[in-house]
Amino acid sequence: MSVKIHIDRGGTFTDAIATFADESRPPIVIKLLSEDPSNYKDASIEAVRRILEIVQGKSIPRTEKLDTSCINHLRCGTTVATNALLERKGERCAFITTKGFKDGLLIGNQSRPNIFELGIRRPEVLYSKVIEVDERVTLEDYVEDPMKVKTTIDGSDPSLVVGRSGEVVRIMKKVDCDALRKDLQALYDEGFTSIAVCLAHSFTFPDHELLVGKIAEEVGFSNISLSTKLMPMIKYVPRATSATADAYLSPVVRRYLAGFQSGFLHGLKTKDNSKGVRCEFMQSDGGLVDVNKFSGLHAILSGPAGGVVGFALTSYDEDVKIPVIGFDMGGTSTDVSRYGGSYEHVFETTTAGVTIQSPQLDINTVAAGGGSRLFWKNGLFVVGPESAGAHPGPVCYRKGGYLTVTDANLLLGRLLPESFPKIFGPNEDESLDVESTRKEFEKLTAEINSGLEKERQMTADEVAFGFIKIANETMARPIRALTEAKGHDISIHRLTSFGGAGGQHCAAIAKSLGITQVLVHKYSSILSAYGMALADVVSEVQEPSSFTLDDSNTESIKKRFDSLKEEAKANLEEQGFTESQISYELFLNCRYQGTDSTLMISKPLESWDFKQSFFDKHKQEFGFIFENKDIIIDDIRIRASGKSFQSKEPSVDAQLKELKFEPVQKSLATCVKDIYFEGGRVPSEVYSLDNLPVGTIVNGPSLIVDKTQTIVVPPKAVARILHTHVVIDISHGNEYTANDSLAKASTIDPIYLSVFGSRFMAVAEQMGRALQKTSVSTNVKERLDYSCALFDAKGNLVANAPHMPVHLGSMSTCVRTQAKIHEGKLKPGDVLVTNHPSYGGTHLPDITTITPHFEGDEIMFYVAARAHHADIGGILPGSMPSSSKELSEEGATIKSEKLVVDGVFQEERMIDLLYNEPAKVEGGSGSRCLRDNLNDLKAQVSANQKGINLITSLIKEYGKNSVLRYMKAIQENAESAVRQLLLGVRERFLGEDLYAEDHMDDGSKICLRITIDEENGDAIFDFTGTTEEIYGNINAPEAVTYSAIIYCLRVLISENIPLNQGCLLPIKVIIPDNCFLKPSETAAVVGGNVLTSQRITDTILKAFQACAASQGDTNNLTFGIGGKDPETGEVKPGFGYYETICGGSGAIDGLDGTSGVHTHMTNTRITDLEVLERRYPVILRKFIIRENSGGAGKYKGGDGVIRDIEFRIPVTLSILSERRAYHPYGMKGGKDAECGKNIWIRKDILPSGEQRVRQINVGGKNTCHMQAGDHIVIMTPGGGGYGPPSERVDTVKKANGVQHFRANGTISQLQEIQHTN
């Protein structure tokens, strides 16, 4: 008898399902612990052994090697690679890279993971040592060339070659093979056996990398991970980190596979050592691969990928085509994914803190699961992200654990102890402990009630239910994000629940999302293993391209596909598939010229019209298309599938259509339990799923249980039993419209305070996604340089998605100012626009649109969207000149205008303001991208309307008075948290005032005295003594100071409090008129937003003695050509580039500073070296840590960086930087850090014809005219040290314990980009 075995080895449990060719024979299901060393060495082998015992009807000793003669195939998923990555237990490996980039992966994209964490905790690199190869290539042409010159190769210059992408590559320096061999031999002699290799531009020119690999193989390295073979895609950093991940993980995976194979007779081979039984492993992309081809890089999401395949192929009907959301809720986290007829892949993700460039299913892990811990913090219910883990686990596990979501479900009657095996307690022989859970909830309830008024006292049931509501909201938000980010309407989806804990939450989450139907498969708790049975064996092949997508290139593209198809076919034929069993999917990875947003476009079934498919997908995801913009093909990809032999089960829709349904017989209920739902406990029938006939209808409230899952059917919901699924239909009645009960309650409900806090924040987040979707500029659409927020009727901030620290306090200043100006003058259909620093703006490129929402004649609330526009005129492209002295030189100024009047967009007025007015300034120009300005402003208006619609829906759900009441309450909650902080600070400082001062490089002084009231925690932040307005551009609008204050308060509280106006309610700010923190209306301010904001932050933190100074700077570098000629007025075509450069962070008590990272008020990413050189005529010669530039101390300050850029053509360059004169200060005996330097390496030709190289310090702020061959070398400041150096202990230097979730797909990408601006 031939058996097919499918195994998912998870973190806690290993699941297995065995099926037979005779489909009348029921499958065998096995569930066992993944780790049980006292009983077995390997859980997967043990699962096979138990299955074979059942199949063969005989006992098989654990010591006996397993005979595979009756096995048709083995298919496995494993967390071995994931766990090694999460726990940092991979192979010791070395990294081989191009000279000048030894710290490239340490710096990464220069952003920090958490913008509100003073002690920056960045994941450590995976390699143990770096070797630099003295070689270099670059791309000869550059994309932004206004003349569009294309180099052709005629053989006259042997250093020019054509790369795999079709681009011309210049070989500047070849590999010195003798020196490399010597270095690699020394490395090998140190004991290294695994290396990762990534050289600059090897995605298109692999020759040097292949040579390194050849020499390494000759030296004797057993594992050589070449980035060009793993994933030949542009972007050095993610490709390099992918190579190091493979070098780190593949030896671990191979050892595991060798151990696995050794458990079988002849090691899964025949007696004559030829290939034996088929054995395949699941890869991160949802495809299977032969056991001997399974590698570390592609194993990271092996288990979760099986779950996606499982739910996709069991829940989606190809005829009905209803898309499905996968909801996989486990113990520590929840995985969210989507399927709409094809697998959705991402090609650059961050997994376990490591950026991976490899095809992975778009799986998004949320820090909420059954084991998520429950907290009462600052008057709010908080779920996670901390987890109780398996040990000690939840309280009910009887191991002295913590209160968790599982405990809440148990207390409320949603889990039945009798349905669980007796595996708990110290001897693992007891049932779940309800009584201990109840006692712990009663303790927590007493703590909560101690801070509540008598009439608002809560029961333990209410507290537990409150945590369930918060957990559900936490999990619902990323599901909204996943669908909306791709332009889908969430309400037309189904929700498919799987995983051990999903059944208790899926109906409530569906209701929250507006989803009407939930599917729960009969194998939902082992769906990842079941997915292995349904999956195909896959071979993915791709290569880079630089083709333009047009008819002239179609034949060339077809030839490239043919070549890739042969390679993919050969891979699958080697694994035993015949040509008739192989199918192919063809893809082009495309983007518009000048953008980074790529879309993976599949070939239409009946044509080669990729262009129309690109238009359709771009329109869906982003809301628009460019008719006349070139479409660039970055990659050509083939996915070849060897088709699975498993027959598909009947679809849900077919069963719903064919079956006749009847109400359940009450006699089938095993018991009746009092289960808590909204409002109280309700008698609810409990049914065993095994006893429910197909075609049965079960009304809620009820529980449906089997051996591995519990499904909650809430009141008004209806469950239907199919052959393969339980289908739950959700009622969507409005519970609060009639009585507005929350508003009538005499006190604030802390549960709904937490719910509303989350929902208000979700409004701001969804506004942001709407803005990103409908905008057209790179700044907004790709860098996500924007903020969206919700305000009450007075203009007070209610919720601001915390992506841009410099916007946190300033947007409320802006809205309050505009509300006052237009008081009584606004009407429905009006939208305001402003960017002026004296009216709540930060700098001119940040334009804010404000929309009021009316009820009758009364404004109920405002929404606002602020976006950074790439250019709004002024004396230099980018509207950020380093030499501006007056505001008018920096571009268009808009004090207060109506952008929309009675629903009509005022386009002519905006053209006048953005284009005509700035051009009247001497040396100035109107906006250089007016069309983008207008389109992005319309996108901002649309985002505001999205916010109004969402709040209107919230009002419909909970009632107007409740929403308005909780808008106020959430501000009061933040106010309370800040007051508690300030009272604690006053006590620490023994009632003394806090004082600090700092200096800008021109000597201008920032003075701050903080006085805290001992009674109520009120505080005065008094900046008296600060220098007068500056004749330059480091003046900071008043709103910037408010942003710095709210940012500092948030990091000092160090907990996730609501960010709103309440944070500033205890604060009185005194800023003298006409000082450079409150300049006049015409003062230049561009440096205030990007430089002075950092120094205000340093000064505040210095007063609190919280942190040594960080680099106090953002190192703004711009260069370009073209624009308006100041002498002739002629506008010449050109380009412009802008970047900010990281430095060192200041040390804090207990923690070293971090090197090469952005701090405080900025968190922008830096352009990848390969993208930089492809787009612009530059060579990045060096980007390394500036060693020992951080201040010494008990805790050392972080080091700055050195960034060396060589120019290949003449350009105009501007630098706007600080801390070139005043050192970043140390604290509590810690030493100051090194100042920064900006060095121009200039090549002058003397009259004699000789070349002289000069090194010129250009100072902190300057404009230089660089010639071809000149370099700019930016050496950024470090961070100050903390504590006396004599007390340093080297064992306590770095932050550890960063929480990494296993899968970070689309949602994480959006959050990362937006948190890095």
Swiss-Prot record:
A single Gene Ontology CC term: cytosol
GO biological process: cellular detoxification; glutathione metabolic process
Family membership noted in the UniProt record: Belongs to the oxoprolinase family.
Pfam family name, one: Hydantoinase_B
Membrane spanning residue stretches: none
GO molecular function, one term: 5-oxoprolinase (ATP-hydrolyzing) activity
Protein name: Uncharacterized protein C11D3.15
